[in-house]
Amino acid sequence: MSPQCFICSLLCWKLQTSLQHPETRKRGWIKERILKMASMFRSEEMYLRQLFLQVESAYCCVAELGELGLVQFRDLNANVNNFQRRFVNEVRRCESLERVLRFLESEMGEEILPVISGKYPETPPPREMIDLETVLEKLEGELEEANQNLQALKQNFLELTELKHLLKKTQDFFETETNLPDDFFSEDTSGLLELRSTPAAVAAKLGFIAGVIKRERLVPFERLLWRACRGNIYLKFSEMDTPLEDPITKEEMKKNVFIIFYQGEQLRQKIKKICDGFRATVYPCSESAGERREVAAGVNTRIEDLNTVITQTESHRQGLLKEASANLWAWGIKVRKMKAIYHILNSCNIDVTQQCVIAEIWFPVVDILRIKRALNQGMERSGSTISPILTAIQTKLDPPTFNRTNKFTAGFQAIVDAYGVGNYREINPAPFTIITFPFLFAVMFGDCGHGAVMLGFALWMISNEKSFLAQKSKNEIWNIFFGGRYLILLMSIFSIYTGFIYNDCFSKSFNIFGSSWRVRPMYNNGVWTDEIVHDNGFLQLNPKTRGVYSGNPYPFGIDPIWNIAINKLTFLNSYKMKMSVIIGITHMVFGVVLSLFNHIYFKQTTNIVLQFIPEMIFIISLFGYLVFMIIFKWCRFNVNNVQNAPSILIHFINMFMFSYDDSTNRPLYEHQQEVQTFLVIFALIAIPWMLLIQPFIIRAKHQKAQDKLASSSLSESPTGDIEVEIMDSNHSEKTNQEVDSSGGHGGHDHGEFNFGDICVHQAIHTIEYCLGCISNTASYLRLWALSLAHAQLSEVLWTLLFSQGFKMTGWIGLIGIFVLFTVFAALTIAILLIMEGLSAFLHALRLHWVEFQNKFYSGSGCSFAPFSFKTIIERNEE
């Protein structure tokens, strides 16, 4: 794993150091290709340039840069209020257009969908905003007028419908109830009066009010009427057969028709107020049956006419929305582009003549020709004759970090950036993570069967990625899985690979090449007899017996015979634990080696001598030696001398205690005591080497710089000032390149020097590294623990669940194995694939973030945020 990564890093460093040679400064596609290849392992080299644009061409030039998406603008008006900037009125106009577009979209709802084309429309010229405002304002006005008319018509339709039901129910009431008793109104009424037979003469003297009320308000309405009128009323109500639609909220309403009989003006006023309080609608209703029939006929005619008018109005409204839907998506893109351009122009300065826009931009060096081409295209579109000007400026700002990615590498880069965006031009862990992350995941997850299921899921997402991208799902969990589809692909492939290494597929082993162990020789040599086999539940194959072990290990992976061995767990524990230690220490050493390339690139010779070398000495002397002992023991001892094999753990503990008097634990090799003593002393020397020397060297350099500055200030002269100014102007381009390439790694030298802070910082770094080597090595044992847990869970599901189906016979066995397989598959996906897979993913993430990246990766930079229409539109759509 690590040799290939080491070679790639060495090649990257060689390419980047060779680019500094004058012979490689030639223009052409060869340099561009080499720069892009080198940028895989480091962030892109960035330039900060001052951009001068004519006011007339500024809009078009910024639009072209937005289409390109490779330029980050600095805000030169950070101290200016947003409402006091130059183009604030244009931004407000764009926001007003966005409001209209949102209104149109809300009116369309889910019935009418905007027409979406495959390609984004071009950025409109500034004058097109006026035309767009005219079109949208006209469309908004017509739609609002249509909505108001439709609402008024529906309100009128609702009232007529209520009146129609009221007249019908009232007519039914008067036809069925014609008489009221003489003593209908009495002071001792105890409740709401119920209908009884009464003379028609008394009924004629009564007044009545008819109306409509919502069904849920009827009970409190009835109770209040009884209490307020002291029971001196007669209330009759009936439910409407069909629900009505509220013209404002579009909600369905259920209403009841009521009729209230009363006697006297005072009661009438009370009833009217109660009806108003409960928002009951009261309609005039004639006492004459003939008049009621005439009114009902007129209402029916008006309802028919209203239906026709409502249909025509709704058709007109739908026509307006369909007309808008054809261009709504394109209008939205255009407005967002215009708004983004004016936001960028607000971050620029305007010179005193009001004729020039001044901007400061970051961009990758390799794309400078594309940027110049885009600026020229913007100038031509605007009709300007003055070309944009790019000038170099000096800065102490840290350049942004830009790592170019594609759909395959984006997921791995996201894992790295989640920990922290790298410092400018430091080694990017993402290319190495492409291999190491799926590999460490697979060490914990290794199973051919589970890996194959995961591989199928990844291939399904990749084969349908175009359709999934077009759907633009808003499900966050799905988007996480889909965004990491290539990561899942590699994790599944590596899981299948490690599954073959472990010889594990759903807790079962493959016997592809035939086992290297034989049982028959145990009988042939007289070690086993029928009585021994019958009387012993556990038998052991002795590799010393001739013919039992062939002497040649299984060609690939673990011998399948271990799958049925009782001591399988003991063997796998030892194997996976030692493998985890070897992988972990190799991974950490590789991280320390990568720090060397950072020191070389940034020309930090002091860090190479006082940081990298003692770090390597410490980790190699102690933990590299542990790896050596593991491998040496594997190679040195076999079945013939296994009884003499010492314990590595005891040797490693005795190494730190300088204790070599343990006669029960034999040495691994000759002169082991001398070698281990030397390594421990060498590792102890590395600690003060890291801790003490560098702070004093930094103080000496600072003192030397202060003395040089003091002497230069004493001998300062006007002539000297002029010479320095001329030299600086002649070499401004070179100075800028040096500042750009160095990034922020020298920025701390410009602050106030504090020797105590430097000592504390160095002490923290030394303690963290030394203790971290111990804790990080132990942390890699999670590879062993999770691999063991995954294998045991898989075996439990097979043994206690699915294998029970093979013990059934007949039709019961057929049905049972089908049911058990369904449960087995569901639990395998839920527990072993999702839960265990997520657990292994998080542990692999921890091993990369903490144990690996902290050896060389600072992760305290700022991300490159280019001005890109594509990014702005996609973010808005989310």
Predicted ranges, named:
Residues 5-8, 12:
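Cysteine-centered motifs
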Residues 38-47, 54-70, 220, 330, ...:
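Conserved, carboxylate-rich catalytic/transport cores that coordinate ions
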